[in-house]
C-alpha cells in the first residue's frame, strides 16, 4: 500500500473525529468531514467552501487525488460538489477544502463532523503530444454522442 503524508490541521481529528479511513477492503474512497466551528446551512442555489481539517502531500508525480461527491448527498438531498470534482496534484500541500452546492429548493444543514465528500487516489499518466496529419483508421472513426447505439 502506498503511504501518503497527511497533515492534521484541526486538533479534533484523532480526538473527536477519526482520520479518514476505508470503510471496507473494497472501498476506493476515504470520507472527508466538515470541520467547521459550528453547524451551518447551505441555502438553495448557494455554494460554500468547507474545510476538512486536513492537508495531504502526495509527492509521487504518478499519483493524484480527486475529491468526489458522496452519492447519497446528491441523490437524496440535491447537494453536490460546486466544482463537480476537485483535483489534488501531487505537489499540492495546502488544505483540502470541499465546495458544496445546494441545487435543491430546500436549505441543507451541515453539522460539524458530517461526512461531505470522498477522497480517491488515482494514477497519473502525463501525455506527450505527437502532431499528425491524420489518425490511424478505426471502425468507429469520428462517431460520438450515441454512435454506439442505445441497446
UniProtKB/Swiss-Prot annotation:
CDD domains on file: trimeric_dUTPase
Reactions the enzyme catalyzes: dUTP + H2O = dUMP + diphosphate + H(+)
Cofactor(s), names only, from the UniProt record: Mg(2+)
InterPro entries: dUTPase, dUTPase-like, dUTPase-like_sf, dUTPase_trimeric
Pathway note: Pyrimidine metabolism; dUMP biosynthesis; dUMP from dCTP (dUTP route): step 2/2
Catalytic activity, EC: 3.6.1.23
Catalytic EC class: hydrolase
Binding site for substrate: 70-72, 83, 87-89, 97
GO biological process annotation, one example: dUTP catabolic process
Keywords attached to this entry: Hydrolase, Magnesium, Metal-binding, Nucleotide metabolism
Single Gene Ontology MF annotation: dUTP diphosphatase activity
Annotated family: Belongs to the dUTPase family.
Described purpose of this protein according to its UniProt entry: This enzyme is involved in nucleotide metabolism: it produces dUMP, the immediate precursor of thymidine nucleotides and it decreases the intracellular concentration of dUTP so that uracil cannot be incorporated into DNA.
NCBIfam families linked: dut (TIGR00576), PRK00601.1 (NF001862)
Protein name as it appears in the record: Deoxyuridine 5'-triphosphate nucleotidohydrolase
Source organism of this protein record: Actinobacillus succinogenes (strain ATCC 55618 / DSM 22257 / CCUG 43843 / 130Z)
Amino acid at each position: 500500500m502506498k503511504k501518503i503524508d497527511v497533515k492534521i490541521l484541526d486538533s479534533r481529528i484523532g480526538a473527536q473525529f477519526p482520520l479518514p479511513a476505508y470503510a471496507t477492503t473494497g472501498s476506493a474512497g476515504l470520507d472527508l468531514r466538515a470541520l467547521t466551528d459550528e453547524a451551518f446551512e447551505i441555502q438553495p442555489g448557494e455554494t460554500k467552501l468547507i474545510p476538512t481539517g486536513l492537508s495531504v502531500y502526495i509527492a509521487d508525480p504518478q499519483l493524484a487525488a480527486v475529491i468526489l461527491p458522496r452519492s447519497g448527498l446528491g441523490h437524496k438531498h440535491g447537494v453536490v460538489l460546486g466544482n463537480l470534482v476537485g483535483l489534488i496534484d501531487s505537489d499540492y500541500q495546502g488544505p483540502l477544502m470541499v465546495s458544496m452546492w445546494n441545487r435543491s429548493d430546500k436549505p441543507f444543514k451541515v453539522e460539524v463532523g458530517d461526512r461531505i465528500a470522498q477522497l480517491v487516489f488515482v494514477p497519473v499518466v502525463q501525455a506527450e503530444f505527437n502532431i499528425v496529419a491524420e489518425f490511424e483508421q478505426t471502425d468507429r472513426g469520428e462517431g460520438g454522442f450515441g454512435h454506439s447505439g442505445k441497446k
